[in-house]
A protein has these predicted regions:
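Structured beta-strand-rich cores of soluble
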Residues: 1-28
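Hydrophobic alpha-helical and helix-loop surface patches within well-folded domains
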Residues: 3, 32-173
Length: 173
């Protein structure tokens, strides 16, 4: 297997003999999903479909996906990490797949500095994740996209705060 990429500023490579491979495509773009065998019941079919759906939605909102393929891989722990053409997700969550895929635009394509311009990287990608979830699921999509932040907030935000979910997301990133 080999990949060639033009106009990328970062890359990653993953491998394990425990990966299961599935594939699909959207608009001529190859979609690959690699997931650990033990996560097969959760990931199978969902990861490819959700990645296809994410690339389609992001392409209609922010410009056509510029690469010939995208790979969505399972990773050891929760959360995710992104590179041009590759996202690593700690779950098969639709919101997480969209979020990490969104980084391909806001960080990947724009080549912005993730530290100096965090508002454009995490801030804008968090915004687009909520926008997608609301497009797909209506008003309840907002709650679906913020549920993990509410759990985190309860665990780590000990003092009494009066911030709403929408304010918390913008301040957190």
């Amino acid at each position: 297997v080999s990949f060639y990429a033009e106009n990328v500023h970062d890359f990653a490579w993953v491998t394990t003999p425990d990966f299961v491979y599935e594939s699909g495509q959207w608009n001529g773009i190859a979609v690959h999903a690699l997931f650990n065998q033990k996560n097969g019941q959760k990931w199978t079919k969902k990861a490819v479909v959700r990645t296809e759906r994410a690339i389609e939605w992001l392409s209609t909102k922010f410009g056509m996906y510029p690469y010939p393929q995208v790979t969505n891989t399972d990773r050891l722990a929760g959360g995710g990490m992104e590179y041009p053409m590759l996202v690593m997700n700690g779950s098969e969550s639709e919101g997480l797949i969209l979020h990490e895929g969104g980084h391909i635009w806001f960080y990947g394509i724009l080549a912005n500095n993730e530290v100096r311009e965090a508002w454009m990287d995490e801030g804008f990608t968090s915004f687009q994740t909520r926008w997608y979830m609301m497009d797909r699921y209506g008003d309840q999509g907002f709650d679906l996209s913020t549920s993990r932040y509410k759990d985190w907030q309860k665990k780590y935000w000990r003092f009494n705060n009066s911030l709403g979910s929408s304010q918390w997301g913008m301040i957190a990133f």
